[in-house]
Amino acid sequence: YDSSFLGIGYYGWQITRNFAREQSNYYLTANDSASLSKIFTTISENIGSANIDLGSETVIKDIVTPYFTVPQDAGAIRLSTATYNGSAFGAPVAADPSVTAAIDPATRAVNVTGFDFNQNYVTTNAKADGTYGKKLIIEFDVSVEAGFLGGNQVPTNDGQSGIYAKGTMIKAFDVPTQDVEVKSITPTADDKTIYLGDSANLQELVHQNATFNGTNNAFVDVTYTVKDENGGTVGTYTVPAGSSSGTWAWSDAASGGTVAPEQTTTYTVTCTVSPTQSGTYESVSKDATFTITVNTCSLTISKAVTGDGANPNQTFVFNVMKGDDLVTTVVLKAGASTTITGLAVGDYTVVEDTAWSWSYTADKDGKADVTLSSTTPNGEAGITNTYVKHDWLTSIVDVINKWTAKDNIDNTGHVPGSGTN
């Protein structure tokens, strides 16, 4: 410091630097008004009085997140206090009856009032009455909400939980988290029977077997994977965490999930629930199988022959066509029939080879149209032929050659010679 002469017989002192304190509570300086306000707050904390007005009307608000249950009865809220002795808290005892709890179902909040923080604030220095204050303990039990699929690092308290004075938050509580067991989902799927050539949509057959609302699946991704008998992935349905629905992705994007197997095929659908955060619990999966049974159609071809003199051993040739494609060729005798199996649905035409059986006239121009479908899987085609008699010259036919000479003499049986007509 420096001394300076203020007047006759008077001396004053001027501060040239602050004292370098080694601990708190003794010497504080301020450079501006904000620092000055902080000084008085610090002094208040150290001389043993509350620096914020938190009387018995103060509200302690604990808002439970929607992933856990809220107590239905305020009587389930356990209220107690523990007295501080300057170094540790004593055993909890029941709180004064003036401290009460209430539940607000609309906001899922547990509200506690009646504890006077001004009177009971905790300090390391004894107060004027020799006490060190006490803390308020609020306890209640919660359980996982029904339908919640779990996950890691799930918050138990809403971020608006804290201490409120006159409706204003004074201090927010820390937000603790809890790892919650990840629940599995067992999918289901319908079996289906189709006919060869028909199709089935896998999206219509697979059932999620769960409802997602964005809250019950807030911390897990859910994926349904459909595979064929060879283990190849046909499609996946994914519901991202926090979403109420998902999207299908197919290995054959143009198919839209439609398949047309040529033989009976069994598929597997697996539902995997995966936590989005690291922690105690990992992904869980459940699967189910379903079968698309493929039946085939049949076509019966019959031959009838009319007309006297028909050859009982005459054969008739038929070509079975599907569009421009030859399906098969069959040969029948009169009065016989045959059944072609393993056919797909569609339009067929049975065409008789009339050149083969040229001496027989076929009705309907030798054609018969048949449509096979899931409602009429077994079709029939009949063609009737009529025998037409033809008289033909053969090597055994006798011919009489009759001619007359110029002299009008009948020369039947004689070889003509010179001088004849």
Protein language model regions, located:
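Venus flytrap/periplasmic-binding-protein-like
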Residues: 1
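Solvent-exposed loop/turn and edge beta-strand elements of beta-rich ligand-binding domains
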Residues: 4-10, 14, 18-421
